[in-house]
Amino acid sequence: TAPASLYAPSALVLTIGQGESAAATSPLRAVTLTCAPKATGTHPAADAACAELRRAGGDFDALSAADGVMCTREYAPVVVTVDGVWQGRRLSYERTFANECVKNAGSASVFTF
């Protein structure tokens, strides 16, 4: 038998697409983010994104907005999806932002890729 893992896995795939829902769009960009045992993946700020997710308890709706960001009221919807495992629990998340600026302001680093 395989040895027991010393940590619960945290491995995610994040995508961004233009549109109001993931079902109605194709991903424009995708990154991987692994947070255990250490921050790795193709996410450009893996360390910061993992730290931010840990502070939020893996709850994407609880991520803190980036400070001091001003965005236009332009409506060009961007949808973010997250699928994978966070601390051993499967998760699937989808959120639509009014535009790219609002998406980037939705977290300090998690959605900035």
Swiss-Prot record:
Keyword check for Chloroplast: no
Protein name as annotated: Subtilisin inhibitor-like protein 2
Stated role: Inhibitor of subtilisin BPN' and trypsin.
Entry keyword set: Disulfide bond, Protease inhibitor, Secreted, Serine protease inhibitor
Primary localization class, coarse: secreted
Source species, domain of life: Bacteria
Lineage: Bacteria, Bacillati, Actinomycetota, Actinomycetes, Kitasatosporales
GO (cellular component) term, any one: extracellular region
Record organism: Streptomyces rochei
One Pfam family linked to the record: SSI
Subcellular locations according to the entry: Secreted
GO terms assigned for molecular function: serine-type endopeptidase inhibitor activity
Entry's family note: Belongs to the protease inhibitor I16 (SSI) family.
Site (Reactive bond): R73, E74
Subunit structure: Homodimer.
Disulfide bonds: C35-C50, C71-C101
Entry keyword annotation includes S-adenosyl-L-methionine: no
